[in-house]
Regions:
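Alpha-helix termination/capping residues and helix-transition junctions
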Residues: 14, 62, 87-89
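Secondary-structure boundary/capping motif
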Residues: 1-10, 35, 67, 93, ...
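Vicinal oxygen chelate
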Residues: 1-2, 38-39, 56-138
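Short, well-ordered turn and helix-capping elements at secondary-structure junctions
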Residues: 21-24, 51-52, 96
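Core segments of cupin and vicinal oxygen chelate
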Residues: 1-45
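A short acidic-to-branched-hydrophobic micro-motif
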Residues: 47-49
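Amphipathic alpha-helical "stalk" segments
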Residues: 26-43, 52, 59, 70, ...
Length: 138
């Protein structure tokens, strides 16, 4: 994170995460900087502001994390999440098909880390699984 407080605000105030561990300084052989822990549903995110970072933004084309998705429990929740981002002036894509298993939209955090809300429709997933088993047996 290039600005830990800004990231905490985004994940907590915009996405609804809970600050589980307040910002603190870390200094070890593997990390020097500040960190905090936020929890969103079943996901815990350690937010790191590395001392060695010279203000560079996240680049999804580099080796490592491309993006991660938060799971919406329904298509209604997906729409609610998109509306919530609109209310917080966070740009996002349109809700669209997610490879035939549901719907999704993407957006980015303040450092440009690609994020996604994804709804996987259990009926479509079951149909896809059934089709895969039929195709494998032929």
């Amino acid at each position: 994170m290039s600005n830990l407080e800004r990231s905490i605000s985004f994940y907590c105030d915009v996405l609804g995460a809970t600050l589980a561990r307040a910002p603190y300084d870390g200094d070890s052989p593997s990390f020097s900087g500040r960190m905090a822990l936020v929890v969103l549903g079943a996901l815990a995110l350690d937010l790191f502001e590395h001392s060695a970072n010279e203000g560079k933004r996240f680049d999804p084309s580099c080796t490592g994390l491309d993006h991660f998705a938060f799971v919406a429990q329904s298509s209604k929740e997906l729409q609610t999440r998109a509306s919530w981002l609109d209310a917080h002036d966070v740009p996002h894509s349109e809700i669209r098909d997610a490879g035939g298993v549901g719907a999704m939209f993407d957006f980015a955090d303040p450092d440009g880390i690609q994020l996604e809300f994804l709804f996987v429709d259990p009926e479509k997933l079951q149909q896809l699984a059934s089709y895969s088993h039929v195709a494998e047996s032929q």
